[in-house]
Amino acid sequence: MFFNSLLTNFAALEVGQHLYWQIGNIRLHGQVFLTSWILLGALLVFISFGTKKMENDPKGLQNLLEFLWDYIRDLARTQIGEKVYRDWMPFIGTLFLFVFVSNWGGALIPWRLIKLPSGELGAPTADINTTIALALLVSLSYFYAGLSNKGWRYFEYYVHPTPIMLPFKILEDFTKPLSLSFRLFGNILADELVVGVLVFLVPLILPIPVMFLGLFTSAIQALIFATLAAYYIGEAVEEHH
């Protein structure tokens, strides 16, 4: 009884105000959906323009997109392995681009100029619900990768190299999504808060270098998230001897 009450109170905790959409019994964070759709739409437009007229000698947007493609391919090949990396390139690439665009969108776009009935817009990755959803998606993906490539032999991983490792391997399955989600959430939220406070206190000069540092941090966090996702998938499909 006490435990259920504690969980209920913990789930009710909020930081700031939020815009909610009520769909039946489901309560959604409206501002997260709005910013996600806007950023995904901008990303799709960017990609469609870059691939509209493909040339043998790439330049402009096509050159940038081919660079990203090569980078994601090399990342997936290095972390997952030569055998199955092609199957996971779209997933790793989508993760990287969504996190990257979400992080940079929060740093570059003045969302607070858009007034809402309640709450305010910001980077989707500055919301813990988004980062937890992404981390759980990664967890489901590496479970699927292991089972689809090895079948029931995948569970041998939990007792390799010795059965003593079983509780630690199970605990690891819980800590992986926690570390993924809280690392991304904490870094992006902290960056938004620091820039917001500096803009309020010293609105002219000081926030600019901090914003550039935030852009660098945002790109690094997207790279870390995609790299760890690929590493976990590679770990799941790796053959243990």
Curated annotation (Swiss-Prot):
GO molecular function annotation: proton-transporting ATP synthase activity, rotational mechanism
Record's subcellular location: Cellular thylakoid membrane
Ranges annotated as spanning the membrane: 30-50, 91-111, 128-148, 193-213, 214-234
Membrane association type: Multi-pass membrane protein
Keyword hit for Disulfide bond: no
UniProt xrefs under InterPro entries: ATP_syn_F0_a_bact/chloroplast, ATP_synth_F0_asu, ATP_synth_F0_asu_AS, F0_ATP_A_sf
One GO CC term, this protein: plasma membrane-derived thylakoid membrane
Domain of life: Bacteria
Major location category of this protein: membrane
Entry keyword set: ATP synthesis, CF(0), Hydrogen ion transport, Ion transport, Membrane, Thylakoid, Transmembrane, Transmembrane helix, Transport
Short name of any one Pfam family annotated for the protein: ATP-synt_A
Signal sequence annotation: none
Quaternary data: F-type ATPases have 2 components, CF(1) - the catalytic core - and CF(0) - the membrane proton channel. CF(1) has five subunits: alpha(3), beta(3), gamma(1), delta(1), epsilon(1). CF(0) has four main subunits: a, b, b' and c.
PANTHER family: ATP SYNTHASE SUBUNIT A, CHLOROPLASTIC
Role played: Key component of the proton channel; it plays a direct role in the translocation of protons across the membrane.
Stated family: Belongs to the ATPase A chain family.
Protein name stated in the entry: ATP synthase subunit a
